[in-house]
Structure formats: structure tokens, C-alpha cells
Regions:
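Membrane-interface extramembranous regions
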Residues: 1-152
């Protein structure tokens, strides 16, 4: 601690060191594990929202499923902080790379006379994407922001 009420790991001293980061790391990993399984087991809905400029959309969707699984498992492993950091960076980049598919999904859905999911789904999803980028970096111990206060 550096004279603040927030520990360097982002957890309140009352909650114990690292509990918040650890809990969110497990939650994010679970999210990506489930998403990865769905990308592999049921790729068609994901292929359908893949932008037309993406080559080999079916293969790309399968590769994204494998990337989600690998990132989630690397995030959870307890042995290597560098591997956890790499997973955080990889999952953050992944979230940036799939953003065009999320935008395409919103455009396709909202263009329908009766949208299936509507604005109540798509708008929060758009705002969630940068949060997923930050969360992957934070739980992967790549960044400390906003919980650190600089070098001094």
C-alpha cells in the first residue's frame, strides 16, 4: 500500500489482496470458455454475423473459438504470470478484433422490420466491448489503471 485505501492489486484491504482481481479473472475466463465452446459447437450464428470482408468466415469463427478457450485457460493457470499477462493481452486484442462482427450483428438486426434483439441488447453490448478490453488487461495484470496512483 502507498497510503491509499486501494491495494496495488486493485482490491480493497478489507477484501484481501487480489480477491477482486481473482474473482473477475475467473468470471472473464468462464465467459470466454463458454463463448469458445459455442463458437466451436454452433458456429453458424457467428458465421452469419461475420462481416463480408472477412475471408473464410467459418474457419475464422472456429479459430476464434480456439483462441477464446486458449486465452481463458492461460488466464486461469497459476504457474506463470507472463503467460497470464499474454492471455490478458491476447483476449483484449481478441475483443478489439471481433468488434466489427458485433457492429455488423447490430446493423443486420436493426435493419429488420422486427429486430430480434433490439437496441436494449446491442447498445449495452457496444459499450461492454471496451470494458472487456480493459478487464482482460487488468485481470491479466497487464495494467493497474484505475487502481494505481502513478509512481509516487
Amino acid at each position: 500500500m502507498r497510503g491509499t485505501d486501494v491495494a496495488e492489486n486493485g482490491a480493497s484491504p478489507r477484501m484481501g489482496a487480489g480477491r477482486v482481481r481473482s474473482a473477475l479473472r475467473w468470471l472473464l475466463a468462464l465467459f470466454y470458455l463458454v463463448a469458445g465452446v459455442f463458437h466451436l459447437a454452433r458456429p453458424v450464428p457467428f458465421v452469419e454475423i461475420t462481416p463480408g470482408w472477412v475471408p473464410l468466415p467459418h474457419e475464422v469463427v472456429l479459430a476464434t473459438g480456439l483462441a477464446e478457450l486458449a486465452g481463458a485457460l492461460a488466464l486461469l493457470q497459476p504457474w506463470s504470470l507472463p503467460l497470464r499477462r499474454a492471455a490478458g493481452i491476447g483476449l483484449a486484442l481478441y475483443a478489439v478484433c471481433v468488434f466489427p462482427a458485433n457492429i455488423n450483428h447490430m446493423i443486420m438486426d436493426m435493419a429488420k422490420p422486427s429486430p430480434v434483439l433490439g437496441w436494449g441488447y446491442h447498445v449495452p453490448r457496444m459499450f461492454a466491448q471496451p470494458v472487456l478490453v480493459w478487464l482482460a488487461l487488468w485481470v491479466g495484470s497487464v495494467i493497474e489503471w484505475p487502481f494505481s496512483h502513478g509512481s509516487g
